[in-house]
């Protein structure tokens, strides 16, 4: 899995002009699933995401997790994180998991996350418009194959 983590003051995702998911303070996740991803990748990602201390404490130090601040997560599927840009000018996406596998894996990921913190999502495979107000900005890349 490859996940772009953005600390946000608020974020929302819309599909065809209708709001699909909306959060206040928390994390916006862009989630890519790879063909080799297993349940251990999912468990690792969830554990890291809910416990990662990237929110400021009273002294301004990044010392609090999304769980600590009672924040929320907006999770967006993003197969383009597996883009291969080595040849030509058009990215290839053959490094991403096949849609059926990726959809099931993404759903399982969101269900596990929701056991820890409130989660809103987009719709897998839909054309989505994402709006966010970055907080910091703080942007972190999590790759479950690099641990």
UniProtKB/Swiss-Prot annotation:
Subcellular location: Cytoplasm
Pfam families noted in UniProt: Tyr_Deacylase
GO cellular component assignments: cytoplasm
Keyword annotations: Cytoplasm, Hydrolase, RNA-binding, tRNA-binding
One Gene Ontology MF term: Ser(Gly)-tRNA(Ala) hydrolase activity
Family designation: Belongs to the DTD family.
Subunit field text: Homodimer.
Protein's name according to its UniProt entry: D-aminoacyl-tRNA deacylase
Organism encoding this protein: Streptococcus pneumoniae (strain ATCC BAA-255 / R6)
